[in-house]
């Protein structure tokens, strides 16, 4: 989950309202987010990670939307961990649904996996799911870039909030929704 707190000094006598989420033509599925338009070969942060043989073998048995516990894995490929049926471990994206949460933590099969190809997503593909433009360059090691992307708030999501803040200060009306929290 992402929580965003907007605070405005009381002496300004302005009231921020939560902007109504834009629901244009439904949602964008993760396949379209990653593939449309195609990522250029020389695009920054689009380096593929080498997968181990066991990871590739495991991924061959995991269908889109499944993870290491919900897939029908052969005994020799099952993980030796108890519980965690709702885990993100070795979870493949479902190409027809929005992406699940992109996280900045890592290791142990939590890299976000392609729906068809037996591999983790590149950092550029992860960045696209967070709605970063392809010309935005992340700096640092692959793991550092992965953390930056996972810790980010999706660009398109924060854009609506920033526009609402600007309209609040300009005293321009905008469509809003009621908060599900009590006034603090």
Question: Could you tell me what each predicted segment is?
Answer:
Residues 1-52, 56:
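Flexible, glycine-/basic-rich loop-and-beta segments that form/coincide
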Residues 46-184:
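C-terminal target-recognition/interaction regions appended to catalytic cores
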